[in-house]
């Protein structure tokens, strides 16, 4: 690979034996750097980082993530001190020191489960320990599972946070834990964390908005998918909300950063990365578009690292939450059921009058769910609602069949069943709609017809990859329509809403005269999505987070995706080609095996060298594989991720893992044979009599809801 020299140097130095030995002198040097970083942070004036206006933050950091940012930024500054004074060679030894300190803190934390004191007798150690976040520190007031993974709790119950899913490495896949990198390294200008701004030829990289305008504008290319419906896009977004949540950096006071100004990296925070808007832009009339860098949660000396705030597993985080306190806000604690809002004659999630992102005024409150992005746009709430209703329906069945079960027993059993159903839907219905059979076969993603999956391994890291989160799984943004049609139960039009006018507005859910959210669900099932290609709808490209009546107050999501890749240190597109078996590229012409001539020319018009092509742009312009919706690079990254989520999840619905209360073979068969998204939708809509047999194909023939098999709860009552 043709890596930049600074990146190659950093990688080589980490692979070489450390020049510095781990001894008292090294520990003194490391401790001095950490103390200086702490002192520097304490002395800096935080007033400039406070925002002066309300900013919508879709990736809002919770208390644990803010704690992780504190740790990450101290380690980031300490890294720069060490590298400046001793060179990159000291970092391996420094990380051995920091690992020992971390282990000491973990032991202290575990001992606190049986003792009442966690005081540090050594003042220096007490100060040093401040850089380590205590797991679930913010949730001490909530009920939390034991930290010890050998506790019986972790045998039978999947923790809300993902803690102890892997009992040998308790943090793998846990909420507020680092993303992994497919290539094992990052592409930053300085090898550590500064965003790349220069071309390999020495000039400036093109602005993300310039790329979006020239390559991704759909004005003359609005093509609908011939088969895939709009629900496929929404379920894809729901999956993304389940496993991907990269919180944005916050100001020192914990508030949102205002990164709107072009000079905000200097005037507000180095965690600002505004996007230059070209002159005479067709929509925006400001010089820059706001973007806050993803929160730095690095846990060692070295490269900046992003974190996943939700658990990394397919565990219905949007329904149940990924933090213990978060989980308690959605439960009724009666009969194992979830909270709902039922005052309008139909069911919605509970209202949230304190949602800081909500743009609609009372009484049109946004909602409380396991993921606070639930009200991002009106099409998400129907999915949240049917899953909450399905949980409560099953909980009622368990209550009747087992009257002696208490609230916790009912809740945990139904949650386990719901997650099993969800995983089956993802692997059996969603994935086959866009990945070709060959990719599904190569990554062993297809559910088994019978028997159990014995591929679980503690050595498999289920964590979400930076490439999946920052590029590959964002392909669904191309599927989004500008308009979201509403249909009656008989398929008659009931109006529509525009995506760009309804970001974090909930009033569409309160239209009682047409049945609230059900017409939105009908429209998603029966209407096509946009074709997955390089073109994006007007709302996606211009109006994300726009305030009604204020044109240009939002952002371009495509520009954000491109700039986010640079922020995350993703390598340019061509560095990933060899990974998926494609030939190396040194000229634009050599892209002709995976790109159309039209798309190659589009790239030439923006980039000066193929080595500059951003990963997101590259994967969106690749020609789709036969039988699939995506090209080879995105297909590989998505297939690799879902394989990791299957083989690295001890509680995966088809798996049998030692020391784990997995589903029995009979229960697995029940899930395989009777779970379908169509049935869940049918069962939990008041006015649904017929449904598509293929739930993600808008052309599919419809059948009576009563003809679809229903899960038998008795099969799960041992």
From Swiss-Prot:
Q: What class of enzyme is it?
A: oxidoreductase
One Gene Ontology BP term is: defense response to Gram-positive bacterium
Renumbered to this chain, the signal peptide range is: 1-19
Question: Which residue intervals are annotated with compositional bias (Polar residues) in the record?
Answer: 45-64
What GO annotations for molecular function exist for this entry? Answer: heme binding; lactoperoxidase activity; metal ion binding; peroxidase activity
Site (Transition state stabilizer) at 373
Which positions correspond to the propeptide? 20-146
**Gene3D superfamilies associated with the record:** Haem peroxidase domain superfamily, animal type
What EC number(s) does its UniProt record assign?
1.11.1.7
Tell me which residues bind heme b.
477
User: Which tissues does the record link to its expression?
Assistant: Expressed in the hypodermis and gland cells of the pharynx. Specifically, there is low and transient expression from the distal bulb of the pharynx to the anterior of the buccal cavity. Whole body expression levels increase upon entry into the dauer phase.
Q: Where does Ca(2+) bind?
A: 242, 311, 313, 315, 317
Bias type Basic residues, positions: 126-139
Q: What happens when the gene is disrupted?
A: RNAi-mediated knockdown results in reduced survival in response to infection by E.faecalis.
Compartment(s) of residence: Secreted
Which CDD domains does the record match to this protein? peroxinectin_like
Give Gene Ontology CC terms. extracellular region
Q: Which residues form the active site?
A: 241
Q: Which residues are glycosylated?
A: 354, 551, 592, 662, 673
Q: Where is this region: Disordered?
A: 41-64, 108-144
Q: Give the reactions, separated by semicolons, that this protein catalyses.
A: 2 a phenolic donor + H2O2 = 2 a phenolic radical donor + 2 H2O
Q: Which residues fall in a compositionally biased region of kind Low complexity?
A: 109-118
Predominant location category = secreted
Q: What does this protein do?
A: Peroxidase which is involved in maintaining the cuticle integrity in the hypodermis and pharynx. It thus plays a role in conferring resistance against Gram-positive bacteria such as E.faecalis, S.aureus and C.diphtheriae, and yeast such as C.albicans.
* PANTHER family reported for this sequence: CHORION PEROXIDASE, OXIDASE/PEROXIDASE
Q: What is this protein called?
A: Heme peroxidase 2
Q: Which gene encodes it?
A: hpx-2
